[in-house]
């Protein structure tokens, strides 16, 4: 079994890379792919860069060049659930674009033309993530809707508008739905694992800078525990 792991920023993949053994590196189109062993599994870890286009490029290259059996997207996110604190984790129950609108042609808000309204993660990956939750200690984790768009959300007015469109949204970030859409296109199972770096409010820019390392570590820990559950 080979697992592809994608994070957007260095703090989101640094702990994973540091824990790998037998690591080898290859750079394609300016994106570094590091293959090796992590938690007893063959993995390929890459830092995609921020945003949906960067994530799509990295995911496509990862799938085409390394043919993983599954893809895990790890990293940070803004939180939309009052019961979660910075550092807590959201496991994707579904993933949607929050900045897509082709409703004029009969699609749902957030649904790209000729694509499903929501991208559903692989049940066995979600199950493995839920089994890993028990080992997280004080870190809380829930399943929930993760939404993606090419914006850092820190405006309360925009937050409320997003919640009107996606009332069950647990977290938002900038890569997950793009990665999920590419995986859907290629028929590769995926899951998104995100640790909260901020609460998508006026304090978010300061919180993000302060807590991105913490969020990256918690998300990486969750990924490693998930890998241990996979057979």
UniProtKB/Swiss-Prot annotation:
Enzyme class, spelled out: hydrolase
Recorded metabolic or biological pathway in which this protein acts: Amino-acid biosynthesis; L-methionine biosynthesis via salvage pathway; S-methyl-5-thio-alpha-D-ribose 1-phosphate from S-methyl-5'-thioadenosine (hydrolase route): step 1/2
Any single biological process term in GO: L-methionine salvage from S-adenosylmethionine
InterPro entries referenced in this protein's UniProt entry, alphabetically: MTA_SAH_Nsdase, Nucleoside_phosphorylase_d, Nucleoside_phosphorylase_sf
GO CC terms, sorted: cytosol
Similarity comment: Belongs to the PNP/UDP phosphorylase family. MtnN subfamily.
HAMAP family found in the cross-reference section: Salvage_MtnN
Protein name, as recorded: 5'-methylthioadenosine/S-adenosylhomocysteine nucleosidase
Native organism: Shewanella sp. (strain W3-18-1)
